[in-house]
C-alpha cells in the first residue's frame, strides 16, 4: 500500500493522451464536463514542431482556463528522421540523433515555454539530462514538468531512480508491469507514475480496467492514462486527420468514465474528486 500522494492529497489523476491540437483539446474538455470526468492532464504526441505558435498559445489558454496540464512531445525524433535503425526497431523511435537532435529539442522547449507551456514529454535520456540541468540552473522555469515518454519505458525500480535523478518529474512506465511491480517502482522513487490502463495497439494493446484499484493502492500517486486499442496511429497529426483525432479524444474520455464507474463500484473508498484548482505539482500553462 502506498501512502504517497499528489500535492493536493489525491492518489490518482486522469490523463488523456494524443490530444493533437486545440480542436481536440476543446472536444476533450467538452466531453469531460458532460461526463463529469476530472481530466487534469492532456498530452500530445506529434510534437511541438507540428504545432503553430497560434495553436500552442490556444492550447496554453485552454489549459490555464480549465486548470489542466498541457504536455507537448519533443522532437524531431528517430522515427521521423533520416536514420534507418528506427525502421527495423521501435526502440530507436524516440531518440534525439546527434548534438543537433539535442539542440533541436532544447529549441522546442524554449519556444513552448515562451508561449506558456510548462510540461514536456521527453523520449531521450540525453535530452532529459540537459533539460534537468538547465532547470536546476534556473535557465528553465523551476515549475517545468519533465514527463518521460512511454518510448523511454521504465521497467524497474533502479531505472526509476535513474530517471528521477536526471530530472524526470513524472515517469511513464512500461505498459506491461503488474501492480506489484509498479509498487516496487513506487517504493524506490517519489515521482508520480504514468500508467496506461488502456494501451495503444503499438504499445501492447492491453485493457487493464479491473486492475486500476490495485494499481492505485500500490503505486499512488499515479496518472491513469486512457489510450485506445483498435484505433489508428495518427502521428504526426494535422488538419487531414483532425476529425478523427477529435473522435478519438472524445472516446478516451468515455473510456475514463468507464474506469471511474468501475472504481466506484468495486472500491468506493478510493473514489476521489478533482482536487485543488492549481496544485503545485501540476504543469498548468502560464500564458
Question: Predicted regions span which residues?
Answer:
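Active-site pocket-lining/capping segments in soluble small-molecule metabolic enzymes
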Residues: 1-117, 122-154, 172, 179-287
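Conserved nucleotide-cofactor-binding alpha/beta core module
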Residues: 156-158
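Hydrophobic, aromatic-enriched interface-forming segments
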Residues: 166-169, 176
Amino acid at each position: 500500500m502506498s501512502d504517497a500522494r499528489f500535492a493536493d492529497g489525491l492518489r490518482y489523476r486522469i490523463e488523456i493522451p494524443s490530444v493533437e491540437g486545440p480542436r481536440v483539446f476543446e472536444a476533450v474538455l467538452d466531453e469531460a464536463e458532460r461526463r463529469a470526468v476530472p481530466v487534469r492532464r492532456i498530452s500530445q504526441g506529434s510534437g511541438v514542431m507540428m504545432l503553430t505558435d497560434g495553436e500552442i498559445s490556444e492550447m496554453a489558454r485552454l489549459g490555464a482556463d480549465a486548470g489542466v496540464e498541457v504536455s507537448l512531445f519533443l522532437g524531431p525524433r528517430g522515427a521521423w528522421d533520416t536514420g534507418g535503425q528506427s525502421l527495423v526497431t521501435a526502440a530507436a523511435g524516440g531518440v534525439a540523433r546527434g548534438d543537433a537532435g539535442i539542440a533541436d529539442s532544447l529549441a522546442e522547449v524554449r519556444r513552448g515555454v515562451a508561449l506558456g507551456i510548462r510540461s514536456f514529454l521527453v523520449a531521450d535520456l540525453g535530452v532529459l539530462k540537459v533539460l534537468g540541468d538547465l532547470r536546476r540552473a534556473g535557465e528553465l522555469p523551476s515549475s517545468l514538468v519533465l514527463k518521460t515518454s512511454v518510448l523511454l519505458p521504465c521497467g524497474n525500480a533502479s531505472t526509476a531512480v535513474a530517471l528521477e535523478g536526471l530530472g524526470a518529474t513524472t515517469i511513464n512506465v512500461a505498459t506491461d508491469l503488474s501492480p506489484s511491480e509498479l509498487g516496487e517502482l513506487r517504493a524506490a522513487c517519489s515521482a508520480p507514475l504514468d500508467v496506461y490502463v488502456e494501451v495503444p495497439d503499438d504499445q501492447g494493446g492491453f485493457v487493464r480496467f479491473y486492475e486500476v484499484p490495485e494499481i492505485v493502492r500500490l503505486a499512488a500517486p499515479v496518472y491513469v492514462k486512457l489510450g485506445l486499442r483498435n484505433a489508428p496511429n495518427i502521428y504526426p497529426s494535422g488538419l487531414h486527420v483532425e476529425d478523427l483525432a477529435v473522435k478519438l479524444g472524445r472516446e478516451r474520455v468515455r473510456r475514463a468514465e468507464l474506469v471511474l464507474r468501475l472504481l466506484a463500484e468495486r472500491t468506493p473508498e478510493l473514489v476521489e474528486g478533482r482536487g485543488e484548482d492549481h496544485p503545485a505539482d501540476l504543469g498548468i500553462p502560464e500564458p
